[in-house]
Design a protein with these regions (language model features):
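Compositionally biased terminal segments of proteins
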Residues: 1-161
Length: 161
């Protein structure tokens, strides 16, 4: 169900000409680390109004109190450019969903997980992705300079077992 909603959001983005991407837990699952998620997070680099209008036209309901869209009971959150520390660079298509590259996803998760102790799930996601893809220290070259050290520490800890 959630993956179907992510696909619908991707279609709406393409049709509206929005260069957005599904991020968060859905992106983690698409990149191979199996875990549960209850919502669809969408990075929106453009002013959000165009995507918001397109989502409404596509049958997504907007709850002003929660500041989220939903369809079939699945919440859809728009993540604006000023809410991320480093906007993702590369968009890719996985299972019919427009998402971010593995490097961008790991970078985003490291930034939120390292800076907010209440976001431990983000670091758990990075660990899961490192294990699934058998990433090594040299993968850090694909990340922002300010998170490379944290990534290498996680790889080292995983390799020590």
């Amino acid at each position: 169900m959630i993956l179907d909603i992510a696909r619908e959001v991707s279609v709406v983005m393409r049709q509206a000409g929005v260069n957005g991407a599904v991020i968060g837990g859905v992106a983690v699952v698409l990149h191979g680390h199996i875990r549960t998620t209850v919502d669809v997070d969408v990075f929106v680099p453009d002013p959000p109004e165009r995507l918001a209008d397109a989502l409404r036209a596509g049958g997504f309901a907007f709850d002003a109190g929660k500041k989220e869209f939903s369809k079939s009971g699945v919440p859809v959150h728009l993540v604006l450019v000023d809410q991320v520390r480093r906007p993702p660079i590369e968009r890719i298509e996985l299972e019919g969903v427009t998402t971010v590259s593995l490097a961008d996803l790991v970078d985003m998760k490291l930034r939120t997980g390292s800076s907010d102790p209440l976001r431990a799930q983000d670091l758990a996601d990075v660990i899961g992705l490192i294990r699934h893809h058998q990433l090594r220290r040299d993968f850090a070259r694909n990340l922002g300079a300010d998170v490379r050290g944290e990534f290498k520490k996680l790889v080292d800890a995983i390799e020590r077992g």
